[in-house]
Amino acid sequence: MFYKIAQKVMFQMDPERAHHLAIGSLKMTANSPLTCLYGQTIAPAPVSVMGLTFPNPVGLAAGMDKDGESIDAFHAMGFGHVEVGTVTPRPQPGNDLPRLFRLKPAKGIINRMGFNNKGVDNLVKNLIAKKTDIMVGVNIGKNKDTPVEQGKDDYLICMDKVYLHAAYIAVNISSPNTPGLRSLQYGDLLDELLSAIKTKQLELAEKHKKYVPIALKIAPDLTIEEIENIAQALIKNKFDGAIATNTTLTRDGVSGLANANESGGLSGKPLTELSTKVIKQLAMCLKGQIPIIGVGGINSAEDALAKFDAGATMVQIYSGFIYQGPKLIKEIVNAYRLK
């Protein structure tokens, strides 16, 4: 009930202003009696992924809490994990405003944020300051002004700094809003990046006597051959997980709607089927060797079950969470428990 009222107010506001207000409000109310306004108790439905045991299979996807400011509030809502970021080595403002658009009739969102964040050092402070023991994944990327050829250096810097504070690390090479970033998904650039990240992971594991899994987040706009090549690279470099998928550049199902022609990545309900299709294709290529976290257009428990059926071991929500509220977490967990 509270969420429906809050949503009605926020949907009258500019989307990015509403986002900042939401994160700020959650930060202020976390670990206080006011969590009763959005908190809920969800019975455990444990799932093992990447050598970790999560209390339930529903996580918050990266992009909602980029700087890790409201982790404890999302824990109160019942998320099994929170993925913060995308974070870059240095703070950056992201792309010009406006850069976030609702497509309400389609339950979709278009964003061209451009990895706006306060930098990895700020994120680490917030990870240290959190009071709950929720599993936190850290999604890492490269700064906009770092040449693609040197992109791997940015990922290694972020890995070094977040390693001790992350349950797992997600490598984002699939955002459409950083020029040239998606080129890292192909050929030699992909293999060089994954190899460098794996080497760094093993060095850090030896140094800290702690193994932190790494997962690769991929785009939905890939051919079957490209998915096969990514799967082979993941297996070759012994990655621990794959996250499928990021936002899409396609506009299927939204043509004619207000804001549909805005540039950027499309998420939400219009992405549902494409994301599930990519998960299924990726699962066939990985043959059970590497687990998949399914994300993209989950707007209901049925959407989540389709991701599990396609081959995902765990799921994440973001746009669906904005449109449906915290009740979506409980609905998915309950459906998973009955599955």
UniProtKB/Swiss-Prot annotation:
Gene encoding the protein: pyrD
Binding of substrate, residues: 66, 111-115, 172, 177, 246-247
Cofactor: binding comment: Binds 1 FMN per subunit.
Protein name: Dihydroorotate dehydrogenase (quinone)
Subcellular location, principal: membrane
Cofactor requirements of the protein: FMN
GO molecular function, one term: dihydroorotate dehydrogenase (quinone) activity
Family: Belongs to the dihydroorotate dehydrogenase family. Type 2 subfamily.
GO cellular component terms listed in the entry, alphabetical order: cytoplasm; plasma membrane
Quaternary assembly: Monomer.
Main function: Catalyzes the conversion of dihydroorotate to orotate with quinone as electron acceptor.
Cited PANTHER family: DIHYDROOROTATE DEHYDROGENASE (QUINONE), MITOCHONDRIAL, DIHYDROOROTATE DEHYDROGENASE (QUINONE), MITOCHONDRIAL-RELATED
EC number(s) recorded for this UniProt protein: 1.3.5.2
Keywords: Cell membrane, Flavoprotein, FMN, Membrane, Oxidoreductase, Pyrimidine biosynthesis
Organism: Shewanella baltica (strain OS195)
Cellular localisation: Cell membrane
Glycoprotein as UniProt keyword: no
Pathway: Pyrimidine metabolism; UMP biosynthesis via de novo pathway; orotate from (S)-dihydroorotate (quinone route): step 1/1
Catalytic activity: (S)-dihydroorotate + a quinone = orotate + a quinol
